[in-house]
Amino acid sequence: IDALLHRVDGILLSGGAALNPLWVGEEPHSALGGINPLRDAFELLLIRRAADHQIPMLGICRGMQILAAALGGKLEQDMTSARPDVALLKHSQNAPRAEATHRVKLLEDSFLGQLLGREIFVNSFHHQAVADTGTQFRAVGFASDGTIEAMESTTFKSILGVQWHPECMDNEDSARLFRHFVQQCASYYRARQWHQHHLSLDSHCDTPMFFDQDIDFNRRDPKILVDAFKMAEGGLDASIMVAYLAQKERTPEAHLAATAKADGILDRLTAMVEHCPSARMAFSPEEVRANKAAGYRSILPGIENGYAFGTDLANVAHYRQRGIVYTTLCHNGNNEICDSARPNALDKERFPATNGAEHGGLSAFGREVVAEMNRVGMMVDLSHAAESTFYDALAVSKVPIVCSHSSSKVLCNHPRNLTDDQLRALAAAGGVAQCTFYCGFLRTDEENATIDDAVAHMLHMIKVAGVDHIGIGTDFDGDGGVPGLASASELITLTRRLQAEGLTDHDL
């Protein structure tokens, strides 16, 4: 099926026979009509895999019902038996198929309500119905007897379902619905073409944090947001996976332990990729390009927290020899290198007069670290760094620096985000800020963050710094991910959204 889906830009699921209730764990009702077992099996799998690939889908009548069944909803095998106390409309009309026989009311705040209006007239040819859309859909259209007549995705996918048969009705409502579906298919095609011919990079991913949970990168593992399958589905060519180190004690013993932990994580990362036939390690842009040309995904290693260096400058060269492409100078809490944007409780206790600021930016050792990173060809990453550290590093570094996973402070006032002045300064120095998708960095009311907020941050950052100085650093598997951008498989949706905002192939 995946081979088929690579050639498909949209799926229209038509009407037809009833769904075999055994597929949804139910015994057949006496009123069950004819079934098509081969079609059931094929479409149930097709829908799930198409949803993983973010392919637009439109379900009509049975098509809406099987969409719901495939993605977690429930059906009424026979509407009359399921709701004996309800005076049902005649849902299997004797009138000609092109004739409308009842009204459907669409929710005002729904997409279909905005596309078609609050009330439309439809035909009807069914005795089964969607009883519960499940969490992946929202019921947005209803007949006067309460029957669900339309549903749409709750996860920002281009998936719609309607219970009536618009293909039989020669009217503007039907034309609008089909035009919209074709437009979504064209949008998906354009994004897929872009990904086939251009490189895409996620500059920050924390999948190694799940090594202790027996993850399998070589299958679609539900425990992680980035694996070989999800990268392929979302069109992601390369991911920088980091060895994350929480900031702990700053004793000689603790520093040695941090270095050993980083080395252990990197060993496991290398082994993970070596056991994946569709991925390869990469340590330079040239290797990423070569891997894509040969049909492989690229995994690049990074370190999140210069705590791994301890107080030994030689560790910088050691980690570059291991292929590390960047090191985030600090995490939450100061270290020997610099001040953090979020000093920890011990920092604030030790330095109450400065609210935890210890070095006033880079320490003397930190300046040596930045210079050594420049020398060995390792990028300096300033995400998590205090603003004072940011400007010190810009002044010290002889080459452009990055902020691998930071968003806009203007749109979300969080100490981890970047001010517009920082974005301009970073761009002036040739650096890049990668917008991140952690909900708390996108909105102060983080529970409401969605792909809409991620797009807003990216567009603002592009406006301030210029399109050449903004990228993406999802923070997937490190608490990054919001509805619409919930895993690597959904990154093609971001491409579609940015193209819809007017970004050209060259911009992207």
Regions found by a protein language model. Give the residues of each.
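Amide-donor transfer/coupling interface in amidating biosynthetic enzymes
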Residues: 1-13, 36-53, 80, 84-193
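Short glycine-rich anion-binding loops that position phosphate/pyrophosphate groups of nucleotides
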Residues: 16-19
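Glycine/threonine-rich flexible loop motifs
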Residues: 21-36, 412
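A short helix->loop->beta-strand "cap" motif at the edges of active sites that frequently abuts
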Residues: 50-56, 297, 378, 399, ...
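Gly/Ala-rich beta-loop-alpha elbow adjacent to hydrolase catalytic centers
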Residues: 59, 63, 68, 72
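Histidine-centered catalytic micro-motifs
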Residues: 124-129, 161-166, 200-207, 385, ...
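N-terminal hydrophobic targeting/anchoring segments and the immediately downstream early-domain regions
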Residues: 190-352, 413-472, 476-507
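Active-site core of metal-dependent hydrolases
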Residues: 329-339, 347-425, 434-439
